[in-house]
Amino acid sequence: MAQNKRLIFKVNGLEKDYGSYQALKVKKLEIHPGTIYGIIGTVGSGKSTLLNILAGIDKESSGTVLYEDNPYETNWLGRIKVHDDIFFSKAPSFNRSGGTVEQYIAAKFNKKKNVIQNRYFKDGSFKNLWTRNMKEISVGEMNWLGMILACETDPRVLLIDDYGTYFNSNMEKDFRNKITGMNRTLGTTIILSAPSDIYIKHFASVLIYLDHGHIWKIRPGISKNRNPGQRNDKKKYTKGKNRNRKRNPRRK
């Protein structure tokens, strides 16, 4: 009997409701290790909700979400225990920090603080960000800071929401090189979301398109740097009441 391929995330019958509003309904989704995924969808498509659930920040209303074949554990208060080897670029801990950016990075990276300062905060428009309070920086600056921490933390699984939304072309190319380098040299599993595939399609192996909380299409990206072991799914979903799905065989 052939062995089942190891998965990072396995999602079955996932639903997420906020009162009477259903934000997400995903019948099945499998995330393979060492692969770069792009989740594409406009505002309200459910992409941020999906990342929050995968990160362990939010809990599904029904269905199962497994991380390496195990469900997320909760503490005695019912709060989800977040895995240390999963990094989410929009983790709530950023907003709860009351110190400066310098203090936050010093506490998180210790001796590596000076390296990070010279690498990202030495020149340019972000130089003054170093001494500002975390609670006072803008959404765009917080997004950029989350990207820096994502690249410097070296997690096993990296989740990035709203990739490229607040970047100019040079910033996007710089972070793209860092992300693909992590994937290529360290085997990091990376899941990024964006309202458009304009950037992500060039380096993601798998593109997942969401619409009103449903997956309606999955196709391979156009990346030329895929790992040999990556398996790319290409599935097309037809719209309609029953959302009948036609599945093509998996391709390596």
Regions from the PLM with identified roles:
Residues 92, 97-112:
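Q-loop/switch helix immediately C-terminal to the Walker
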Residues 193-195:
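H-loop/switch region of ABC-family ATPase nucleotide-binding domains
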Residues 120-136:
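Conserved ABC nucleotide-binding domain
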